[in-house]
């Protein structure tokens, strides 16, 4: 994905037009923009929302490990969980279709009633690892890291905007930049 500041700015403004509002919308929508832009196929089947079933977010593991169904019900009641609407808008713009099976009612029902321990012990997503052992023998399996963090460097790449002319209020966080985008205070000439 591009690291050029001008390209970043144009892409973030475009994501805003497609519905990005929150920091997570911009940081998670950014790679999806490039996936759909470069996708040769007409349909993308994604794993968006999968982590919610396993309750492996920081918040989930700290506060809801023993109340996993409450955690899931809260997540999946949000019609835009995992930036679903933004992803559908990006797909539509590029005349593509997106299929998000982990957000389907059937998948939500399939996970209903499962516990954190049965899904994640002795390893994160152990239930999936055990059901597809032959496949996972062939690849390196890592623990969960948010899409926009870790080795993707998506979020850290965006921090360059704090040094440029979009930082009109001397923000310390890129969230301020996203708020300026939402208020229509920044643009590209």
Kindly give the residue locations of the regions a language model identified.
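ATP-dependent adenylate-handling active sites, centered on carboxylate activation for C-N bond formation
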Residues: 1-130, 134-135, 150-161, 188
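Peripheral terminal appendages
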Residues: 64, 138-189
């Amino acid at each position: 994905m591009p690291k050029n500041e001008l390209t970043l700015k144009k892409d973030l403004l475009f994501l805003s037009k497609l519905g990005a509002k929150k920091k997570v919308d911009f940081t998670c929508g950014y790679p999806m923009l490039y996936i759909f832009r470069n996708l040769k196929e007409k349909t993308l089947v994604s794993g968006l929302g999968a982590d919610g079933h396993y309750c492996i977010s920081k918040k989930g593991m700290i506060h809801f490990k023993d109340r996993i169904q409450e955690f899931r019900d809260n997540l999946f009641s949000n019609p835009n969980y995992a930036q679903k609407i933004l992803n559908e808008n990006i797909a539509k713009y590029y005349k593509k279709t997106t299929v998000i099976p982990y957000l389907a009612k059937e998948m939500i029902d399939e996970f209903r009633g499962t516990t954190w321990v049965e899904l994640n012990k002795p390893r994160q997503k152990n239930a999936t690892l055990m059901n597809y052992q032959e496949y996972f023998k062939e690849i390196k399996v890592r623990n969960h890291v948010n899409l926009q963090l870790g080795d993707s460097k998506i979020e850290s790449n965006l921090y360059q905007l704090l040094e440029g002319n979009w930082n009109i209020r001397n923000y310390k966080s890129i969230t301020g930049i996203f708020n300026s985008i939402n208020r229509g205070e920044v643009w590209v000439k």
